[in-house]
Amino acid sequence: MGETEKRVATHEVRCFSKIKMFLLALTWAYVSKSLSGIYMNTMLTQIERQFDIPTSIVGFINGSFEIGNLLLIIFVSYFGTKLHRPIMIGVGCVIMGLGCFLMSLPHFLMGRYEYETTISPTSNLSSNSFLCMENRSQTLKPTQDPAECIKEMKSLMWIYVLVGNIIRGIGETPIMPLGISYIEDFAKSENSPLYIGILETGKVFGPIVGLLLGSFCASIYVDTGSVNTDDLTITPTDTRWVGAWWIGFLICAGVNILSSIPFFFFPKTLPKEGLQDDVDGTNNDKEEKHREKAKEENRGITKDFLPFMKSLSCNPIYMLLILTSVLQINAFINMFTFLPKYLEQQYGKSTAEVVLLIGVYNLPPICIGYLLIGFIMKKFKITVKKAAYMAFCLSLFEYLLYFLHFMITCDNFPVAGLTASYEGVHHPLYVENKVLADCNRGCSCSTNSWDPVCGDNGLAYMSACLAGCKKSVGTGTNMVFQNCSCIRSSGNSSAVLGLCKKGPECANKLQYFLIMSVIGSFIYSITAIPGYMVLLRCIKPEEKSLGIGLHAFCTRVFAGIPAPIYFGALIDRTCLHWGTLKCGEPGACRMYNINNFRRIYLVLPAALRGSSYLPALFILILMRKFQFPGEIDSSETELAEMKITVKKSECTDVHGSPQVENDGELKTRL
């Protein structure tokens, strides 16, 4: 008997360490995959500028991750449970690393980045063709040299990023469905919310690192080390600036490959957490029988696929959850993917500043919310139903607060000929014949060039030539333009490189926007886990992996892939001025109509989120009559523990045992 107790105790320690170690390894994998994903999102603007592509193509590149995920999600979710899940997760992490490495290759295969400019790196009178010079022919038109047009084919290098992101999506496929199902299979049902909360925290810690990495890389010039940055005429706030995006992808590749190592040492199955509490070994015998039954089912690996699909499609709560998720994810992907671009244009910040602010303000409350709701559900034994009702009310409250964002806005950058007249009067639409004015009509300036300068009068101009400037002093970003005929001020009628900065009032509004985002992020994190628990518990245990995979499949097909594409195309329609390539073709957008941009960015997600509350309300109604498997399992566990107590009491009170046993069964039924 002593040997049996010793064996049970040893098994308890081993079981505890394995399930916790797997949770730790999976959390690390979540950190690495979310690090790569968030870094990719922070670098979208840099990729857009590097390859001179419109936002719609950038959205397609971003959505290509979901395409890669889509290729294998159903296969992995169903057949993956029949195979060695930890090893499949490890292989997926390696593939993610290879995808990140491929995404960094264009930097090494293409030449140096040449931003659109007419300004010479040095200031000397013989090269000042970018200034206002009367009685000259217009020589600043896009070059039509065929040799230079061939060089522009290098812009197709973005295909490497596209393919690399697809491969990264393929590698990410097994991590969530197989990892979640592995924990759900071998963890106590009451521990699942806490474990999932820990995993979600890992998904938040990864973005924290990713945003810090993105902010750092965005502040470094893309060709640092190979060019003299003192000769640059652009700063990180310029829409032509490209940060060192490739450095972060190399780091992400290494982190993903390292995260794969622990999974190759985990067994295919683990003992169910908590089974060691039964000293008679009854539950251990049941577990062994369950293992044998699973082995028999593996011989017919495909026979249950169609019945499972039919069962899931006939589950009303599950199907409504998919509809709700599709609408919500459409909204959140659109908002999050283009949040850096929106803050850059709305509040006049650089990519590095914006990315850092997003990380500092948004991610800590999300992390706290994930841990808090997981702890509360475990500590106070809150049922999935109660948590779902609470999540719905909080989410609706946060949705109403969202409309305050419409009041936290700034005006367009005042650019003469684009968003304002040369007298400084703002006008909403761009009219091309207003780019030229009496003050610069004799300068023979190009109307397509984009070398913005800020005048002493607080008004920006598309170029020093269009500002009527006839002289320049200094070099690089310190260059100053003087004798500008279009600048009417009490000073020297001079201008400096770059757009004019927005005032302190706009900076204060940015703080209000970030505070609102903190509240929204915290409430979102609290409502996310109850919603995910409803998804896990509304389907049968044997259908769990397939159900998770099908849910991911639908959200990718109807949200993850199309959302950034159509949203990017809508953003492109708000562009006021496109960059110009050497062959005269349009490049990346340099200036947006921020009023139209704001309407698209805020209104469309609001409409999508608002429509998602209707199916969510039907879910709450259907849940009243639905018995969740997790709640049944919990009651059966209590009944088993009660029966053990009853057996002990039979030794002293034979007549009392039937009454206690019946009471326990009655409580279970209630």
UniProtKB/Swiss-Prot annotation:
In what tissue types does this protein appear? Highly expressed in the kidney, moderately abundant in the retina, and even lower in the liver. Expressed (at protein level) in the small intestine. Expressed at lower levels in brain,lung, and retina.
Q: Which cysteines are joined by disulfide bonds?
A: C439-C469, C445-C465, C454-C486
- Biological-process GO terms, alphabetical: bile acid and bile salt transport; intestinal absorption; liver regeneration; monoatomic ion transport; monocarboxylic acid transport; organic anion transport; sodium-independent organic anion transport
| Any one GO molecular function term | bile acid transmembrane transporter activity
Q: Which residues are glycosylated?
A: N124, N135, N483, N492
Q: Which residues form a coiled coil?
A: none
In terms of pH, how does activity behave?
Optimum pH is 6.5 with estrone 3-sulfate, taurocholate, prostaglandin E2 and L-thyroxine (T4) as substrates.
One GO cellular-component annotation of the UniProt record comes to:
basal plasma membrane
Q: List the ranges whose topology is Extracellular.
A: 41-59, 112-155, 225-242, 334-353, 406-513, 572-605
Per UniProt, what is the membrane topology?
Multi-pass membrane protein
**Where is each Kazal-like domain found?**
433-488
- Give the protein's biological function: Na(+)-independent transporter that mediates the cellular uptake of a broad range of organic anions such as the endogenous bile salts cholate and deoxycholate, either in their unconjugated or conjugated forms (taurocholate and glycocholate), estrone 3-sulfate and prostaglandin E2, at the plasma membrane. Responsible for intestinal absorption of bile acids. Capable of thyroid hormone transport (both T3 or 3,3',5'-triiodo-L-thyronine, and T4 or L-tyroxine).
Domain remark from Swiss-Prot or TrEMBL: A conserved histidine residue in the third TMD (His-107) may play an essential role in the pH sensitivity of SLCO1A5/OATP1A5-mediated substrate transport.
UniProt-listed NCBIfam families:
oat (TIGR00805)
List the PANTHER family. ORGANIC ANION TRANSPORTER, SOLUTE CARRIER ORGANIC ANION TRANSPORTER FAMILY MEMBER-RELATED
Q: Which family does it belong to?
A: Belongs to the organo anion transporter (TC 2.A.60) family.
Official protein name in the record: Solute carrier organic anion transporter family member 1A5
The organism encoding this protein is Rattus norvegicus
> What gene does this protein come from?
Slco1a5
